[in-house]
């Protein structure tokens, strides 16, 4: 059994994270199934559309939807249920995924399918509409390249410490995180600190807000900046 896939993505006017998104889309295009042969080709194109950067799922959900739809069509053609075709081809410990990863004993797709089998069959017998789909997201932290976070702590005219970072806060509460880190690593109180929203004019570049990385990398930059603040305060500077 094999899979051949062609993945085309619209990265918009700028590359942004279009490359890594396409990489994830391709490495997960076969889904959580075992194939003896595979050929997967991906291409990202610049267009006049808005940039397509980081988002949850990171390319995996798009190819997953296509793969799962095709499996349902295949099951219909050979006369078996969507559950059965997934169970027969589910990836099992010791087998190899298209990205070269050998899955270990923590892989539980077979057990997951077995757990829903009775309810799935019962729904079919009762004539109820029932669907089934499987997905996985197996990606580690980073791709081996250097990463960075940057942060400035500046005492301004109001005698408060202002936090500057180019890291965008898009709902994950980064401002709260950095403020708390300053409180934790200095002798300052919350009322002594002002978090400045990111801007490209003054705040230092901290890379993308993606993959839950900002708390780790910019948070560490903030902690190191706090060490320098405390060195100055302990030396009598204000």
What are these regions (language model features)?
Residues 1-61, 126-238:
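Gly/Pro-rich active-site capping loops and adjacent beta-alpha segments
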Residues 51-117, 211-238:
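N-terminal leader/propeptide and maturation segments of large enzyme subunits in energy/redox metabolism
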Residues 80, 122, 187-188:
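Helix N-cap/coil-helix junction residues
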Residues 87-154:
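Accessory "access/gating" subregions that flank catalytic or transport cores
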């Amino acid at each position: 059994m094999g899979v051949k896939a062609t993945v085309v993505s619209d990265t918009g006017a700028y590359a942004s994270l279009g490359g890594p998104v396409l990489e994830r889309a391709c490495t997960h295009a076969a889904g959580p199934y075992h194939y003896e042969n595979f050929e997967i080709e991906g291409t990202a194109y610049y267009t006049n559309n808005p940039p397509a950067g980081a988002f949850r799922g990171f390319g995996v959900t798009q190819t997953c939807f296509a793969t799962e739809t095709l499996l349902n069509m295949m099951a219909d053609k050979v006369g078996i249920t969507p559950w059965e075709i997934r169970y027969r081809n589910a990836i099992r410990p010791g087998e190899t995924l298209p990205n070269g990863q050998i899955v270990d004993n923590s892989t539980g797709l077979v057990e997951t399918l077995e757990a829903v089998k009775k309810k799935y069959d019962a729904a079919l017998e009762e004539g109820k509409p029932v669907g089934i789909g499987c997905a996985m997201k197996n990606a580690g932290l980073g791709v081996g390249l250097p990463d960075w976070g940057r942060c400035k702590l500046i005492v301004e005219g109001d005698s408060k410490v202002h936090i500057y970072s180019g890291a965008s806060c898009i709902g994950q509460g980064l401002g709260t995180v950095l403020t708390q880190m300053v409180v934790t690593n200095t002798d300052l109180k919350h009322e002594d600190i002002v978090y400045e929203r990111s801007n490209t004019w003054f705040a230092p570049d901290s890379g993308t807000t993606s993959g839950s990385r900002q708390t780790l990398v910019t948070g560490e930059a903030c902690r190191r900046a706090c060490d320098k603040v405390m060195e100055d305060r302990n030396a009598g500077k204000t």
